[in-house]
């Protein structure tokens, strides 16, 4: 099913009376100029047409800087949004606010790979993107036939940045980031006269964590709530216990087992009627005999250990000897290296269909992630060409597809208690209890080890 059709099914019932609004200036504004504590936000707008979901749509593409200020009026952060709005404007259309994850990831991945009006043409069968040029094609599966789109790059991602005197701790953190993104959303609604339009949030990977936090910020019971119609979670990570295989935390081994089975099936290491069949077998084994065996620890009887080890080998394609040496607990990093070691290959973390070759085949973990270096050059070229050459955005800043500064300085605390794993799933439940019409859509990938799909299923149940 096309992405636009999926989204249409989520928001089909959203009809509302729209309030009158002021006219919005459409002229380009100059590039940002940071002098004497003042910044003039840059705005670049182009009118375009495309066919999406079988419909011909005229739309306005706008890259704009939003300046966030301190309490005393000094600029602290410049956040870039890229919006695609149907022309002429129709305030009855939903507005879909989108962001990627990281923390530190720019919106290029969702914008140029999924929902935007253009997509970069790179192989979809897990082959390397190779050398330029990388064609930028019309995206018939964009959501522009059913919704207006706003891609947000938080500080430290994309072209967005903190001013030189801003303390990173004020923006680089779970709650600080959500507050900033929510503020940008409110300002965009102000500037575009869209307060009474249906509103959706969508995030990928850590962006799903951000979605939960921003939803809490917007609908948090402050008596100034922004009502939301839906949340779209892509490659969901809400409970981080499932991705931290620290000693004593057995959950990580349980929730990644179905991913291992899917990857082993794809690469011909296990036999099954289909990937769906092997995944379902792995699900049932993971929450049954496997979880029980891990929790028994040293009390696990030899016969039970042997039975679990044999089934684990059948599902993962790893040898019983290797599984015994790992005490039945194989981390994802080791799995990437071990699954295809006999072929001299490693597999990807973001997408286990990708394979790569390391300098040292005898190593314990991979040198790098072939599913990332297999696509990043194409996406980087696409977003820079689109923003600078097509939309005319002017900046000397490098586009941060994956910015390092946010991750280095990130504050992960939510006040849930010292030593607790981060879990934002309760905030989605809270948002749904406070808004009876809020709907949530979850999309996962069988081959995505960064955000194990079984972990997301567990979090949302």
Give the location of each predicted region.
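Alpha/beta-hydrolase fold catalytic core
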Residues: 297-450
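Bacterial N-terminal signal peptides
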Residues: 8-19
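Active-site-proximal cap/loop segments of hydrolase catalytic domains
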Residues: 65, 120-194, 241-256, 263-273, ...
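A catalytic-pocket lid/entrance helix-loop region that shapes and gates access to the active site
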Residues: 117-122, 215, 219-316
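N-terminal cap/lid subdomain of alpha/beta-hydrolase-fold enzymes
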Residues: 27-32, 73-170
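Short alpha-helix in the alpha/beta-hydrolase fold that links the catalytic acid
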Residues: 213-214, 325-328, 438, 452-461
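Glycine-rich nucleophile elbow surrounding the catalytic serine of serine-hydrolase chemistry
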Residues: 203-216
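Alpha/beta-hydrolase fold nucleophile elbow
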Residues: 193-206
């Amino acid at each position: 099913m096309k992405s636009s059709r999926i989204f249409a099914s989520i928001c089909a019932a959203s009809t509302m009376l729209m309030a009158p609004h002021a006219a919005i200036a459409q002229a380009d504004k100059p590039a940002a100029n940071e002098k004497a504590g003042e910044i003039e936000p840059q705005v670049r707008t182009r009118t375009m047409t495309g066919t999406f979901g079988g419909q011909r749509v005229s739309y306005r593409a706008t890259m704009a800087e939003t300046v966030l200020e301190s309490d005393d009026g000094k600029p602290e952060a410049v956040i870039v949004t890229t919006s695609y709005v149907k022309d002429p404007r129709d305030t009855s259309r939903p507005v879909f606010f989108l962001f990627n994850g990281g923390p530190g990831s720019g919106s290029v991945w969702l914008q140029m790979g999924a929902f935007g009006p253009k997509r970069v043409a790179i192989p979809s069968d897990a082959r390397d993107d190779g050398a330029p040029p990388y064609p930028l094609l019309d995206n018939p599966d964009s959501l522009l036939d059913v919704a207006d789109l706003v891609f947000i790059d938080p500080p430290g991602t994309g072209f967005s940045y903190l001013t030189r005197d801003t303390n990173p701790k004020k923006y680089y953190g779970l709650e600080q980031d959500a507050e900033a993104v929510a503020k940008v959303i409110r300002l965009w609604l102000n500037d575009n006269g869209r307060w009474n339009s249906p509103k959706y949030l969508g995030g990928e990977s850590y962006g799903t964590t951000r979605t939960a936090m921003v939803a809490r910020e917007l609908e948090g019971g402050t008596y100034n709530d922004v009502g939301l119609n839906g949340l779209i979670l892509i490659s969901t990570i809400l409970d981080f216990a499932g991705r931290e295989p620290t000693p004593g935390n057995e959950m990580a081994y349980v929730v990644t087992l179905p991913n291992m089975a899917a990857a082993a099936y794809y690469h011909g290491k296990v036999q099954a009627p289909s990937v769906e069949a092997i995944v379902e077998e792995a699900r049932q084994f993971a929450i049954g005999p496997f979880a029980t065996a891990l929790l028994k620890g040293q009390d696990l009887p030899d016969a039970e250990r042997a039975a679990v080890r044999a089934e684990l080998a059948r599902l993962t394609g790893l040898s019983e000897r290797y599984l015994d040496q790992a005490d039945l607990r194989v981390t994802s990093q080791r799995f990437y290296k071990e699954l295809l070691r006999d072929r001299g290959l490693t597999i990807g973390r973001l997408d286990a269909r990708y394979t790569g070759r390391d300098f040292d085949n005898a190593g314990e973990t991979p040198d790098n992630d072939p599913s990332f270096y297999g696509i990043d050059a194409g996406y980087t070229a696409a977003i820079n060409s689109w923003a600078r050459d097509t939309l005319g955005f002017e900046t000397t800043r490098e586009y941060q597809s994956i910015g390092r500064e946010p991750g280095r300085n990130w504050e992960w605390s939510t006040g849930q208690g010292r030593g607790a794993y981060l879990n934002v799933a309760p905030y989605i439940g809270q948002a749904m209890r406070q808004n009876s019409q809020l709907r949530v859509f979850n999309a996962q990938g069988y081959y995505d080890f960064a955000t194990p799909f079984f972990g997301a299923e567990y979090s949302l149940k």
